[in-house]
Amino acid sequence: MAGAPEGVDPSVPNVARMYDYFLDGKDNFAADRAAAEEILKKFPHTKEGARANRDFLRRAVRYLVDAGIEQIVDLGAGLPTQGNTHEIAPQARVVYVDYDSVVCVHGRALLARKENVDFLQADVREPDVLLGKLRGLIDFDKPVAFLMLALLHFIEDEHAYDLVAKLRAASVPGSYLVISHAVDPTPDITPQALEIYKKSTAQLNLRTREDIERFFEGYELAEPGLTFPARWRPDEEKPLGDNITFGYVGVARKL
């Protein structure tokens, strides 16, 4: 990445830019790459997990389109990359949300000429403010899908469950919630990984399967339920692969 925009400290690792590095992107700084490499030393399959997460996004959005969803809010969208939500669902109203100024600058530049697509800067830890901004862009009298891919494990419990509850309350029946969430694959080395993220722009909050299931209260999970990314409605032509326990994913419809 070229020089840092005003107000951005390139010496502090940024989780969105680290994720970009895991996806072999170019929008990252030396500090991001160094922190990402430290994570890869502890979790060698992190890049594979990031790709599995993007593959899940593609399949989940296709599912939403087939279910008739015409409005999608992609929370914690991250830096633009290939296979963005609006590309998978070109007829849908798509609003990307991220709190990071670099992410928003890149997103708005990429989407400047795109119709029916917006990039909103907001902090998901302030759901009331977020909803106020979304109401000018989304019709909450109609079903809407909220995507939270690789987001909630960067939010503390008090904010994470409150966010999901308030979005659920604001949406009508027939709306959807899509989540991917990291789990604790290797308890003996996880504390070291947590220390790395403490030096970045967001701390890691790993949860159990039961904790993740709580996010779906008031929703009905679509088959195959809460499962590993590669096992959620996999493409027939694409084999599962060996390393599929990066976290849990689910797509659910509000009752």
Residue locations for each model-derived region?
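Core SAM-dependent methyltransferase catalytic element
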Residues: 231-255
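Conserved S-adenosyl-L-methionine
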Residues: 19, 220-233
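Rossmann-like AdoMet
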Residues: 1-122, 126-140, 168
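Short "lid" loop at the C-terminus of a central beta-strand within the Rossmann-like core
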Residues: 151-154, 182-186
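Conserved beta-strand signature within the Rossmann-like core of class I S-adenosyl-L-methionine
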Residues: 145-147, 164, 170-182
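Short alpha-helix
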Residues: 203-226
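A short SAM/SAH-binding and catalytic strip from SAM-dependent methyltransferases
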Residues: 124-125, 134-161, 167
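Short, glycine-/aromatic-enriched active-site segment of Class I SAM-dependent methyltransferases
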Residues: 187-202
